[in-house]
A protein has these predicted regions:
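Mature catalytic domains of secreted/periplasmic carbohydrate-active enzymes
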Residues: 8-12, 26-404
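N-terminal twin-arginine translocation
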Residues: 1-5, 14-29
Length: 404
């Protein structure tokens, strides 16, 4: 059964089930604001409309924001510095995003010539920036009492931007039942000198408790914030290390059942059924990945999974993700004054668009949720270049069907 038949049967069934979770509200029945202009195709196949929109969107803003932003040493600081779970958790009490302005962020994206925003709803640290009943480890239940994803969804909807929610599917350093380092991947947990009492995973069967948690959170994300452009999964390395533990088909089907137009990405690819590929900085090379963080006994399988998925996904739309900081994705104080300038970003855009790819450009908000002044300046200048034709000429040629 193909996707269109599956979704058609699903919606027909949903219409006959009183109280079904698959029943759409009047707001959801209308075309999402970011898909305006695609009404005809949307009426025929909402997913096809979303794919066509994404191919034409070309340029998006990514944000990595979380508790780690308070430390200013990147989004992997918990793992790299082996910060104990209990110690790291205390940053929930000092989380204060008082300068996180969703409307200003959306306006900045528009000023830069972007068509969509991708933001971390949960990074590897496990802290959630959305309303969830699955854990108190979230921004709404913090002293800040802010549902940042809800605020961002409202701003994007109002301004016609697509919203992708980044979700750390195959890493969670806080959840008690994510698998251990010894189960296959060095980055599954920080390499603590002492066992952490919060970690309860003992055998593969325990991992289902984590998957149930993930699926419940995906239901929340897909039912609380209106139509989403997509779910952006990461980090694929955690999947490559243990593909047997992740029920991808079940996870993907859940997403499509709740929002048929919603796109799914999982970096360069997990099983090849993703809607587009989103490799970091550049497309994967032909040489096998050394997978140094994966147990040697699992590297051959990891490469087979990667090769199979990329063989399929490289024929789809590609989204190259890169950073305005020279190094990591979350805010790094050491990079202050060293961020990329507009000229370099224009080169990235031209290179991506010449290949027919999208560019997803990341900024790491500061601890208070504000965007780096360096990045604001660069993004506005990039937008002026695009509106002036410096970067958009390639786009125009592509739309006319000319070769680039």
């Amino acid at each position: 059964m193909d996707r269109r038949t599956f979704l058609g049967n699903l919606m027909a069934t949903a219409a006959t089930l009183p109280g079904s979770h698959l029943t759409f509200s009047a707001e959801q029945a209308e075309i999402p604001s970011y898909l305006r202009g695609y009404e005809t195709l949307y009426g025929q196949d909402s997913h096809a409309a979303a794919l066509e929109w994404f191919k034409n969107a070309k340029f998006g803003l990514m944000m990595h924001y979380g508790l780690y932003s308070q430390l200013g040493r990147g989004e992997w600081v918990m793992l790299h510095e082996k910060i104990p779970v209990a110690t790291y958790e205390k940053m929930k009490e000092t989380f204060n995003p008082h300068q996180f302005d969703a409307d200003a962020i959306a306006d900045l994206a528009l000023d830069a010539g972007m068509k969509y925003v991708t933001c971390t709803s949960k990074h590897h640290e496990g802290f959630c920036l959305f309303r969830t009943k699955q854990t108190p480890y979230n921004s709404v239940d913090s002293p800040a009492q802010r549902d940042l994803m809800g605020e961002l969804a409202a701003a994007c909807r109002k301004k016609g931007l697509g919203l992708f929610l980044y979700y750390s599917y195959s890493a969670d350093w806080h959840h008690p039942y994510f698998y251990s380092r010894s189960a296959g991947w060095d980055f599954a947990r920080p390499a603590y000198d002492q066992p952490q009492p919060e970690y309860l995973w003992r055998q593969d069967a325990d991992f289902r408790l984590y998957i149930d948690y993930v699926h419940n959170q995906l239901r929340e994300l897909l039912t609380q914030y209106g139509p989403l452009a997509g779910i952006w999964f990461d980090p694929v390395m955690g999947f490559y290390a243990r593909p047997d533990l992740f029920p991808l088909a079940e996870t993907y089907a859940l997403i499509y059942s709740l929002q048929p137009q919603c796109l799914i990405s999982f970096k360069q690819g997990a099983n090849g059924s993703e809607d587009f590929a989103a490799p970091e900085r550049q497309r994967p090379g032909a040489a096998p990945n050394p997978f140094r963080s994966i147990l040697p006994s699992r590297r051959e399988t990891a490469n087979e999974v990667l090769s199979r998925a990329w063989h399929i996904n490289q024929k789809k739309q590609i989204e190259l993700c890169n950073t305005l900081q020279p190094n990591g994705w979350g805010y790094s104080k050491a990079d202050d004054g060293k961020h990329r300038h507009a000229e370099e970003v224009i080169q990235m855009i031209n290179s991506a668009w010449a290949a027919g790819d999208n560019l997803l450009l990341n900024t790491g908000p500061l601890a208070d949720g504000s965007i780096s002044a360096e990045d604001v300046k660069t993004l506005r200048e990039v937008g002026r270049h695009i509106r002036g034709g410096s970067a958009s000429s390639i786009s125009v040629r592509r739309e006319k069907g000319e070769s680039s």
